[in-house]
Amino acid sequence: MKEKIREIFKNEATAINNIPVTDSFEEAISIIYRQVHGKNGKLVTSGMGKAGQIAHNIATTFSATGTPSIFLHPSEAQHGDLGILQVNDVLLAISNSGKTREIIELIELKNNLYPEVPVIVITGNENTPLADKADCYILTGAPAEVCLLGLTPTTSTTVMTVIGDALVVMMMEKIGFNAGDYAKRHHGGYLGMKSRELSGEDKRQK
């Protein structure tokens, strides 16, 4: 069993190292920065199923690090939640296949409401309807899932998470986000205490 677990780790690490690092990353950061920090919009993330859970994590991590973001469930968007979208926002949609019906429909609904809102896509395939609808798309490298059936999102969601982490860290650098900024947004728990220590906030409060 240990050897099998090591093999799983190795395959997932290989998938991460094989993520295509293209100009799309810089383009995505430029779009998010322009819309959120230049126009006071927000980053709206979306995905269905396991990809949706990754999209939700990306949204909360962006928000914690100075870039206002929120997750929009693609199905709930069709029942009124699309109203959360505003004209200066940017939509980040995630779909490994690039063919997820609910995400394609979400972009179509977005176009009916605010066609000027740019769309960034994270996908495993550039030759898909979703990539065609994107202003910018980031490819995952379409890694094979480590799932025994080759079906359950495993490696693909790992790669999506890493891509999201890269975007977050690049944006933190771009906006000069520091420990003091973090402490103001993450007051509770160990990380809140640590960020206040790093920023000297604890000493100022005493």
What are these regions (language model features)?
Residues D132, V146, E173-K206:
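Internal, active-site/partner-interface "lid" segment
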Residues H37-G47, A64, M193-Q205:
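Short, charged low-complexity intrinsically disordered segments located at boundaries
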Residues M1-H37, G41:
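An N-terminal, well-structured beta->alpha segment
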Residues Y33, K42-I175:
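Glycine-rich phosphate-binding loops that contact phosphosugars or nucleotide phosphates
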